[in-house]
């Protein structure tokens, strides 16, 4: 009995030592909620402890945030902060011979007595500079995020203590530093050497390097929250859609749910299995693939070397030399010529993942995109492979430290941010809170340890899996991204009628600014009239051209639509959505301020116009751009967003003919792609209105698809959606076009300027797509992803017929996906079979796949 008591006493003393001695907690994950007074749990069930016992600097300030941004899904650790007006140090015990992951969490909100725009500071980890003269407020504005995570991978050192030093800038008289959360996680050594791109015989040593995570993407798949990461590293993997460049989006591939990933060549902690179960490829048509590529673009800081880690796993093919492709990074060959990429050649079998590391130096003196890293993949003909295609499953980009420095400059503020008058006097917080931890001795401490241990074990038994999405925002973005959304102010003033939610999302203009920019709403500046009111051309901030939509007091669209547009559009940033700069709600006036679209609306270029006629190829590119914007609304945001007023006057064109969807006053958030609907009062524009929605008052994203089908016929036929002057059967363009399509007389009603200029196969694909959009039942209509795929295919057919070698780049770019991650055409791989969905007929499927399997068929 005495022996059992001795063992129990030793066991409890061991846990007592772990509790009261920070120096013995090395090797464990540490998550600090800075400024908190007690432990807390975030929405991913991660435990955060107060930071006091690791803080070695007295007289610091802890301050709660006074405003909670709506996008802040978890209050922990962001609603508390630690403020420093002088240099301060955290000392965290670590194992010096191990690599550690360090995450710093910043929420540049309003803290009592402080102006967040005064916050400029540096952060160092031991002798490594992480941030220098850093402004979290400016950075979050540029990235249009409410909060920010900076993640680093720190190389092993000889020190058993990680010192994290915060130093307010001496360049700003009122400067202070702040931090909301700190994570330190021991990690396995996942880095070795990387091939230096462009120099076949040189490598870059990453085993001893300190790294900053710039991008971490699940290519072709959905976001993977930290709670579902492998190896306990709690990394978040984001969908790659926002970084795809050019018109070729490819298709996404997905393995079956029971497909097994075999980590025989690398540790499980390299990446979770879900990364290797999805991929993006160029698509099923090898002939088209040979004339195109998959391209991703990333903005980075210059004068650093970057490691691009590409993750691969083949889950469809089984033989070497079936799919071989080239890889180019910044137009330099990483894999190609006589040494192309062959996933099965690297791994030796299906379901075996691998990765390749490539190093590239980004020089500020290169010019012409020197702040970007591009990744391109094209099929290779080397060895006459069976398929002409390329594939990528995952991607990570890391910045390597230069002379113990990882810091880049702050983003360059846009003109709107630079002139925004939100400065306040820095008053400082005189309250200095000290959190003292005392240690109890003897039996009380042992019993306390035993109680904590028992509760911990019981909680472990009953804790289930967590299905919540991680609240952490992306860590990507460089120091040169610019945007206009403000995440600093929480409320509007001066008699604003807006809700706090809408008021805190973007810049608020004074009425005097708006009147000055429009010459007191001079009628000569009117460039359009809509349901909300007149649209004026204006100038702000000394020269920036904008479009200002001014409400009409007699309009049916009032405050609700005004708030809806602010709340929805200010959260969204996409190449094919018009950008909201700000609003004015003063003196009884309601105005919305947008980027100026110099080429006006799509309708202005189709009929009743003196403008030059659009070519068919340009019309296709505009339709593709608009489809991308709608597709992003349906699939790219947290919730499905249904536009509800898709028409040619709500598709705007910038100076480069890039199409942008506009006017979100009637938009609704939908049922998040679960096949449900939203019951709502019917709103929209006659001629474009979904008849099923009109009958049942049940709104789905397929209502937008119907409206877009009318837009497609409007693009083809160059006539209004409704024309009461025509005979009864011709009044509605949708009905008339469908009738002609069924009779085989569609060519009789297309725009006379296009006759003889459209490739017949392209016309058939385009018309079939528009016809499916106008199906009476929403269930029979394609998704916007399917529509986008078909329009891309139609463009390829037209370009092939025209003998075009390259796509017109003016409408390139985009941030949407054709597959499961971002929606659209997903090629679901199961038992070696591919399903392209209903958007292609069985005859078309057969033709395309026969071309792939037999290269001679190309």
Curated annotation (Swiss-Prot):
Ranges facing Cytoplasmic side: 453-858
EC class (word): transferase
Glycosylated residues (UniProt): 133, 293, 303, 331
Topology in membrane: Single-pass type I membrane protein
Signal peptide: 1-27
Catalyzed chemical reaction(s): L-seryl-[protein] + ATP = O-phospho-L-seryl-[protein] + ADP + H(+); L-threonyl-[protein] + ATP = O-phospho-L-threonyl-[protein] + ADP + H(+)
Tissue and organ distribution: Expressed in pollen, but not in pistils or seedlings.
Known function: Receptor-like protein kinase that controls pollen tube behavior by directing rupture at proper timing to release the sperm cell.
Family: Belongs to the protein kinase superfamily. Ser/Thr protein kinase family.
UniProt-recorded name of the protein: Receptor-like protein kinase ANXUR2
